[in-house]
Amino acid sequence: HLLYAYCAERGVPHRRCGKLIVAASEAQRATLQQIRTKAAANGVDDLRWLDRAAVHALEPEVACVAALHSPSTGIIDSHALMLAYQGDAEDRGAMIAFHAPVTSGRITDDGIELEVAGHDPMRLCAQSVVNSAGLHAPAVAHAIEGLTPELIPTAYFAKGNYYTLSGARPFSHLVYPVPEQAGLGIHVTIDLGGQVRFGPDVEWIDAIDYDVDPGRAAGFYDAIRQYYPGLRDGAIEPGYAGIRPKIGPQGAQAADFVIQGPRDHGVAGLVNLFAIESPGLTAAQVLAQEVASALGHPVSRAA
């Protein structure tokens, strides 16, 4: 609700298209019920249970035995959102330094001293540092002298590939299968222009690589046809890839967001953000509230 209100206020393009989480087999019904129960415990009270006929009425191309319908789920112009956030920060006096990587740092009596590289290298002394470096957050934390290494999680990379659908859009809702261990499963995403993509899958990698392997298409067809049997051969092609900033290895239970503040590591003014994968963008404003609270700033927690 915070995000929708912000988008309406700032004119960020978005649309509440709704989402279906589908059980492709009877064995997955119990998992759907677990999702519903967990959602209710987290304050999500608008999920509706749909039987096969109700799903068919909403999305005739979707095959399943049951589904959860989330009417409040939507899509957004993520680039416009980030520009809006940047504009808000700069309006409040922030200076954004692009291509300025932090190479090292150390804890001092006066705060945190950072060595910053790039076009204009500098030494920066700060009272507060928020390490929100995504894939590189553990590496940045390790580069700060004085921070206990044992408190820094190991970084693991789980690549997520997307394939693009050619032809007419067969869905009006986002369609998600029952989640798998390391991700949300290969699901249907729709952008504001109507382009349909399927993904992401899970590909564990040792080094950062954003190329999409065309050879992964067979696995995509198999996964998508579990809930979209009408997908024709040759209808999808490689799109793009992202990489999840995991802090557990392949086979481990997925970790929740880690917001590590002074109470956790004992360094005043430092907050580390680890494992901020999807839905980190959706939760950005609430994450910011948590960071501010960890730094001792008063926070107004509007709903």
In which residue ranges do the predicted regions lie?
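Short, conserved active-site loop motifs that form the nucleotide-linked donor/cofactor pocket
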Residues: 47, 93-95, 270
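Helical element adjacent to the flavin cofactor pocket in flavoenzyme catalytic cores
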Residues: 68-128, 285
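Active-site substrate-recognition segment that forms the wall
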Residues: 10-14, 123-128, 132-266
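Dinucleotide-binding Rossmann-like beta1-alpha1 core, especially the glycine-rich loop
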Residues: 1-54, 58, 64, 185
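C-terminal lid/capping helical subdomain adjacent to the catalytic/cofactor pocket in oxidative enzymes
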Residues: 254-303
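A general structural signal for well-ordered alpha-helical segments in protein cores
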Residues: 3, 29-35, 52, 82, ...
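Short loop/edge segments at beta-strand edges and connector loops
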Residues: 16, 51-52, 98-100, 238-240
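A short, glycine/Asx- and small/polar-enriched loop/turn
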Residues: 27-31, 58-65, 106-113, 248-254, ...
